[in-house]
Every structure is written in structure tokens, then in C-alpha cells.
């Protein structure tokens, strides 16, 4: 067996999220069926993490182990798989990696982008791809709010619980570091970009929702700063933005080991 | 009854085209159900023309007659209807017009845009929105080819037959005038824009297909020019581009009567 690291882009609208489910209508299920068809045997793939139903990706990463009978040049893998995939899922890159590589455990960070549309009437081509916020709000305050998330914080107020957390929840369980934030405006769209070492369940959507509540004047920047820097046990983000606008842009790995262009094997 | 002119945008992917069909899965059917629900009585709408299955619109125009019980300000019509429509169809503009206005017969021209993607791997968000032509071809020759269509020509070679044409086909039946053409490139996308006084069935897709055959060297510009300017009875465009990349951008009406901003009534 040889381990391969794949990069995938997908339109999340037709799928029930990344993670395999009994009904088989998830991105992982569709990818595993393509691999299994190609290999003639059941194949499991391992993603860098889940994306929720309706969330998109331009740079999701996963790994799979290919039988030695399928040792083709790395740059032939995308086409070999894309012919077996619906057009809403594309493999954009593949490279052979050492057996110690793991898409989830080797990752050092992720970049997400959230798209908000300010159009008076949502463009039908943005349906499911942008959060429609046509009423008055301030992009300037949104930007100030988003930058408050930078740094290492206890993100308790910006984490939804999956229900499988250890009890009592250990000290530092919700601590994460946001290394970069950016707000950019292009026509009717406002794009928020978050890069961090790790993200909690629904964290980007809860940060975006809270920042937008500040931008439309429902909470102050001071109140938001307290949620971020000194949360009380019951503090919660005032709003969770919908999945529509969210795209996983990139998963980061240590450059020295897995450069985008460098062939390991 | 009061006549209203509506402008609509739609993502054509989920629909079997504009024109009403028994199954009810067309844009016209969905719109008529929204009007009928609002009026409490069956309502027919009249489009500027058909768009085929999978073809999109940013500026389709149609008219409808509203009962006098529904005389609301023109700028309230889009929201009143959009709440009853799927997000892939949006009413973007409405205005009251004189009873003599007809979306089809009053139109003086249309503008269509065709989108080609040159990306090595088609972006999953472009699936159904662009024609994927990743192999080598010349945007420069495409542009020269597209401009050959300007002017008044017998477009016999660029018309698909619907089967309901008069026989024998009258002299001049396929004569049309293309008033403007444009080719623009943005990143991986090449956009071709055609404005004309009228378009035959599949004409934009047949022009685009032929221009692309020239751009990839399958026919010469001289051969294309002959198809346009001196077609023989059996001449046909060498290729019909798929519906995916096609968008009806605008329907033109005499400015003096129906300006976009001018309220008639």
C-alpha cells in the first residue's frame, strides 16, 4: 500500500456534509465509492476534519492508501478519480506521502472563508453560497470585530457542543489560536478569512455571527471583546451564521515535510 | 387588470427551461404558481422568449396582468413574489406598463453572454455554469471569430430547426442582425457577449461552438466567414456549445417608452 495525500474542492449544496453517514449522501461517501470502484475493493479515506452539511471546500485534504497495483504518477490521480466523480466534487491535487502522514493529525492549521452578500436581492447564483444580509450594517465595524478574534483565546463562547466532550470539560479544552484574519469587499460580497491552528465545532459560523451582530449594532465591540477574552461560563455567541457562506480554503501542513509542489516519493 | 413588466434572474440548472411544460418543472411554471398563489386565481405570464433547459438568465423579462385588487407600488412587487419563489429564481425589478406592452413583441433586441472555463480542472462551483475547454485554444482567434458575426446575415448555418417552420422556408426567414460582440477574459473565464435584434433557436450556442472550433484550429476563419456570409443550403455550424455557459443578460425595449428607471404609471 502507498499513502497519497489528495486535495479536493466541492460544492457542499448537494451533500449532507463531509463525514460518512448511513444514507451515503456525504462527500466522503461519494469519494469512497469512487476509490472503491477504481481499486475494485473497499477503500476508506481520512479527511483533515469534517465540514457540515451545506459547507463548501476549495482545499479540503484527505489521505488514502492505494494498492501497489495502482502505482501511477501522482499527477495522473486527479483525472483518474474525477471521471468517477460528480462535477460538484473535484480532486485538484495528489501527491505520494510517507506512511506516517495523516490528513488530520499532521495538519497544523486551516484557513476558512465566509462570504456575506449585501445585495438588496440575493443573486440566484449565490443561493447556498453566501449569507444574505441586505439590511444596513457596517463593514468597517465587522472588520474591527473580526480582528478581535486574533490570538490565543478560550473560545468556549464560540463552540457548539457535539455531545461527546469529556466531562468535566478539561481546562483549556476550548483554547485555540487564530493567527490571521482578513476582511475583503468585492462588489456586493464581503469575504471574511480566518486562519488558525484549529477550529471548534461551528466556530467560524459563531465568530461570523457575533461579528455581524456587532456590525449591525446589536452588541458592542466591548461586549464582543469580553466574550472572546474573558468569557463567563454561560457566555455564548449571540448568533450562528448559516453554513451557506462557509468554505474550507486550505489545510496547512509543515512546509518542510509536505510542500505543495514537492514530490515526497 | 393592470399590466406589469417584470425582470427575473434565474439559475437554470434545476429547471427544464423557461417554457411551461406538463411536468411543471420550468421557470415559467414556477413563476405562474407564485402569481396564482398571490392572486388566488390562475395567472399566465408572457416571457420575452424561451431559454432552453440548463440556460440561465440575469435579465429575462416577462409581463403579467394583475387584478385591480393587487395594486401595490411597483417597487413592492419583487419582495411580494420572491417570498413565494425558490432562491434560484429572483424577481429583480417590476414596473407598471401600458396595456399595449408585450414582453415578446415589444422587445427590440437581446444580449446573451456565454462563459467558457479554461481551468485545467473545472471548479466545482462552475459545474453547469461554464463550458469547460481546458485544452489549448486561442482566445485571440476566438475574438476574431466572434466579431465575424457582427452585422446582418443569413444565419441558416447557425439555426437549429424546431420543426414548426413554414414550408418552404421563406426567403429571409433566418436573417438577423448582430449589433455588438465582445470577448473578455477574467482569470480562467472567457466571456463572449452577443447583442442582436433577435436570435434563432440555439443560435448563440451554434455561433459559440463554431467560433471555438476556429479558436482550436478545426476550421479556418475564412471557412467560418463563408458560413456566415455566403452559406450554402447544407452549411451547418460545426459544433453546438452546451447550454451550461449561456445566460440571457438583458432584453432591450425602446428606451423612449420603457426606460429601466422610469415609472410609466
UniProtKB/Swiss-Prot annotation, chains A, B:
Identify its protein family. Answer: Belongs to the tRNA pseudouridine synthase TruA family.
GO biological process terms on file: tRNA pseudouridine synthesis
Q: Which HAMAP family match?
A: TruA
Q: Which top EC class applies here?
A: isomerase
Q: How does it assemble?
A: Homodimer.
Instruction: Please list the residues that make up the active site.
Output: 52
Name under which the protein is recorded: tRNA pseudouridine synthase A
Give the InterPro entries listed for this entry: PsdUridine_synth_cat_dom_sf, PsdUridine_synth_TruA, PsdUridine_synth_TruA_a/b_dom, PsdUridine_synth_TruA_C, TruA/RsuA/RluB/E/F_N
Alphabetized, the UniProt keywords read: Isomerase, tRNA processing
Organism the protein comes from: Akkermansia muciniphila (strain ATCC BAA-835 / DSM 22959 / JCM 33894 / BCRC 81048 / CCUG 64013 / CIP 107961 / Muc)
Q: Name one GO molecular function term.
A: RNA binding
Role this protein plays: Formation of pseudouridine at positions 38, 39 and 40 in the anticodon stem and loop of transfer RNAs.
List all membrane-crossing ranges. Answer: none
- Which residues make up the binding site for substrate? 112
Enzyme Commission number: 5.4.99.12
Per its record, the protein catalyses: uridine(38/39/40) in tRNA = pseudouridine(38/39/40) in tRNA
Amino acid at each position: 500500500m502507498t499513502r497519497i495525500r489528495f486535495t479536493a474542492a466541492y460544492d457542499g449544496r448537494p451533500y449532507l456534509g463531509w463525514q460518512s453517514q448511513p444514507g451515503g449522501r456525504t462527500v466522503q461517501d461519494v469519494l469512497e465509492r469512487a476509490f472503491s470502484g477504481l481499486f475494485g475493493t473497499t477503500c476508506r479515506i481520512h479527511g483533515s476534519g469534517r465540514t457540515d452539511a451545506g459547507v463548501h471546500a476549495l482545499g479540503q485534504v484527505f489521505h488514502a492508501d492505494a494498492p501497489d497495483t495502482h502505482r501511477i504518477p501522482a499527477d495522473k490521480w486527479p483525472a483518474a478519480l474525477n471521471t468517477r466523480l460528480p462535477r460538484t466534487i473535484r480532486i485538484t491535487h495528489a501527491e505520494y506521502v510517507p506512511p506516517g502522514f495523516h490528513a488530520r493529525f499532521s495538519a497544523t492549521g486551516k484557513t476558512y472563508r465566509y462570504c456575506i452578500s449585501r445585495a438588496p436581492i440575493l443573486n440566484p447564483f449565490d443561493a447556498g453560497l453566501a449569507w444574505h444580509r441586505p439590511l444596513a450594517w457596517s463593514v468597517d465595524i465587522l472588520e474591527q470585530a473580526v480582528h478581535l478574534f486574533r490570538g490565543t483565546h478560550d473560545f468556549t463562547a464560540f463552540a457548539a457542543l457535539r455531545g461527546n466532550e469529556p466531562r468535566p470539560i478539561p481546562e483549556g479544552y476550548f483554547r485555540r489560536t487564530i493567527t490571521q484574519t482578513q476582511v475583503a469587499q468585492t462588489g456586493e460580497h464581503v469575504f471574511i478569512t480566518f486562519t488558525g491552528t484549529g477550529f471548534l465545532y461551528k466556530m467560524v459560523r459563531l465568530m461570523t455571527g457575533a461579528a455581524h451582530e456587532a456590525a449591525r449594532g446589536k452588541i458592542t465591540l466591548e461586549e464582543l471583546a469580553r466574550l472572546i477574552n474573558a468569557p463567563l461560563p454561560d457566555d455564548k455567541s449571540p448568533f450562528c451564521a448559516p453554513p451557506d457562506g462557509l468554505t474550507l480554503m486550505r489545510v496547512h501542513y509543515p512546509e518542510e515535510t509536505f510542500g505543495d509542489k514537492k514530490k515526497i516519493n
